[in-house]
Structure formats: structure tokens, C-alpha cells
A protein has these predicted regions:
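Short beta-to-alpha linker loops that shape the active-site pocket of alpha/beta-hydrolase fold enzymes
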Residues: 108-113, 177
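Short, surface-exposed "cap/lid" segments of acyl-processing enzymes
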Residues: 55-101, 106-109
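N-terminal membrane-anchoring alpha-helices
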Residues: 1-39
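N-terminal cap/lid segment of alpha/beta-hydrolase-fold proteins
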Residues: 29-71
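Gly/Ala-rich beta-loop-alpha elbow adjacent to hydrolase catalytic centers
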Residues: 149-158
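Hydrolase active-site cap/lid region
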Residues: 169-199
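Active-site signature of alpha/beta-hydrolase-fold catalytic machinery across serine-
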Residues: 91, 160-164
């Protein structure tokens, strides 16, 4: 009996001391984008050029209204969902931007759009939010007011940003991911959670 208790206790100890996802920092200030509007497209292209495995059509890009690098009254930022890309909203987001005479930024959010044997293995909620936060900062550079258009988990990020950044003028959400409803969703937050959900 003592041996069983000892083995069980050891198992519990190993489980509780296993790797665990760190609690993310949800609310942060927007990063400073030092490039001016004439340089910002090149700055984005330079950042994307650091990756040699971006899937075609998944790269971050700005579409200027009338192809002129000039700040518009409104800008749009499209936040794609988990495992998605800006193609998810095509052509609706671009059509709406054209109707509103606005510039639009289509970011590739953190760890997305890459050719990899293990896609999104580096993904964390905090880094995903950080990249959405940068996208909002870019949106402010290219428009006086920013509309966030989003799909699925992109809506999760957009709601978080809007809660902390009143400069968000409006949200346009399609199929928002507000809450995970799977009964075992908590497993991912437990020690060894990443390894368990990958099985």
C-alpha cells in the first residue's frame, strides 16, 4: 500500500512541476511605429523579408486608397483568425475599404502564414495579441480613425484592443470567437498541457 501511495505521490509531483503555459499579459500600450507614412510600406516589407518561408499571399501588406501613401480619414485593419490569413476576408475587407475611401492594413499575425512541418508551434496568445497591437499602431499611422475588421480569433484580439484603446473607432466582426466551448479546453492550461493537446 505504501508503495502505491509513493508512486501516486511521485506521479502527482511530476505532473504539477511539469511545463505550463505562462499567464499572458493582456493589456499593454501600443508600440511606437517610427516610420512615417511614406516609409511604412517599405518597413513592413523589410520585416517580412526576414522570413524565407511565408506562404504566398500571406505576407503583411498595406493597400493605400488610390495607391497614394497618404493618411485617410478612416483606416481599416483586418485581423485574421487562428491558423488563418488575410485571404479569409477577401475580397470583403478590400471592398469595404474602397467604399470608405480608406487605407487598409492586412497583417500576418504572429507565427501565421509560414511553411512549417509544425505550423504555429511557436504561437502564444500574448505574442498573437502583441502582433495585433502592432497592427493597430500601424492603422493609426495610416488613418485618423481606425476600424478593426476581424474574423474568429481575430475578433478576440480586436475586442481586447478596443477594451484598452479607445482610439478604435469601430469593430466589424464576423463569426467572433468569444469563448471556447469544448469541455476539455482547460487541459491546455494545465502542466504538460501543450503535450497533452498535441496527442
Amino acid at each position: 500500500m505504501k508503495k502505491v501511495v509513493l508512486i501516486f505521490s511521485l506521479f502527482i509531483l511530476i505532473f504539477l512541476t511539469g511545463p505550463k503555459v505562462e499567464k499572458p499579459v493582456i493589456f499593454k500600450d501600443l508600440p511606437e511605429i517610427k516610420s512615417n507614412i511614406d516609409e511604412i510600406k517599405s518597413w513592413i516589407d523589410d520585416n517580412e523579408s526576414k522570413f524565407n518561408n511565408i506562404k504566398e499571399g500571406n505576407e503583411s501588406r498595406i493597400i493605400f486608397h488610390d495607391s497614394v501613401p497618404k493618411k485617410t480619414d478612416l483606416s481599416m485593419v483586418y485581423l485574421h483568425g487562428f491558423s488563418g490569413s488575410s485571404q479569409d476576408g477577401f475580397p470583403v475587407h478590400i471592398n469595404i475599404a474602397q467604399k470608405l475611401n480608406s487605407n487598409i492594413y492586412l497583417p500576418r499575425l504572429f507565427a501565421h502564414g509560414l511553411k512549417s512541418s509544425e505550423p504555429l508551434i511557436e504561437y502564444t496568445g500574448e505574442k498573437y495579441l502583441d502582433s495585433a497591437r502592432e497592427a493597430l499602431a500601424i492603422g493609426k499611422k495610416i488613418g485618423e480613425k481606425v476600424i478593426l475588421m476581424c474574423t474568429s480569433t481575430g475578433c478576440t484580439a480586436a475586442l481586447t484592443l478596443a477594451a484598452n484603446h479607445p482610439e478604435v473607432e469601430a469593430l466589424v466582426m464576423y463569426a467572433p470567437n468569444i469563448r471556447i466551448t469544448h469541455p476539455l479546453d482547460f487541459v491546455a492550461t494545465l502542466p504538460w498541457g501543450l503535450y497533452l493537446v498535441r496527442r
